[in-house]
Amino acid sequence: MFSFLRLPFLFFLLMFTQSTQAEPDFKIPPIQESMKKMYQIQEKDFTFEDKHYRLFIAVPPKTSQKLTALYTLDGNAQFPIAVNAVNPHKPLPLIIGIGYISDKAYATEERMRDYTFPAEGAEFAKGGKAADFLRFIQQDVKPYIEQHFDINKEKQYFFGHSFGGLFGLYVLFHQPDLFQHYTLASPSLWWGNGSFLPQHEPWISQKPSHILITLGYYEEHPEQDPNITEEQLQRINQRKQMRTINAHQLADILVKQGNSVAFISIPNKNHGGSIPDAIKHCLEQVQQ
């Protein structure tokens, strides 16, 4: 049995935002007792260019096989979801949640800063530091993981939701070989009015093994969401007007450019509500 090291999560009221805002208000679930027996949970804090980060790491028992690694953004909230979603009857992956030294489920300002492309306009002024965050992953996160764990460098998976999914696109456009498999869950394609899309083709210079794009059904059909308010519907429609491409079109374009891409619409789920399902779909690929 493995020990459970400190995991200082605060539990918030259970609710998902019914809008396309980047930070779902989501209760952080405790890691299930059964998974605590299968994983050792570790934390490692980093300071990079005066910014503070925390890795949450789920370490499976040692085997003779190299480990498949899953890296997820928004680690404070989505790391425990990923650990709980692992199929215990299949080979266990190493799970790395990249988060912040914070008790918040979602560090709103930090994730906007770190996960987004540079863009003009007052609405985007607090973002645009994806290049810095990518360097942090390249220079600190990946070397630390590769030094301490025997991972299979041909089986490294990325998961990001909302702004995290947008950051996945940034990596694909600038350093696609950093991971081999990408899950872009409900990517915030409205950011910068779509100005982040490359002007050259193909958009991805080195094709990854696979890209999975997921989207909650109600994100594209918000008028069918039984719980949506008029204010939320207006905001979603405003976001739609800001984008130049939707998730379906993104998948189609990437396929036409020669990439292996799958698109999954998650039934009866909105932006925040689709997170657990998207993580499960990602893990099905990780553990196949």
For the regions a protein language model found, what residue spans apply to each?
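N-terminal signal peptide c-region/cleavage motif recognized by signal peptidases
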Residues: T17-S19
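A domain-start/cap signature at the N-terminus of enzymes
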Residues: Q21-L67
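Alpha/beta-hydrolase fold nucleophile elbow
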Residues: D150-H161, Y182
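A conserved short beta-strand
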Residues: L178-P187
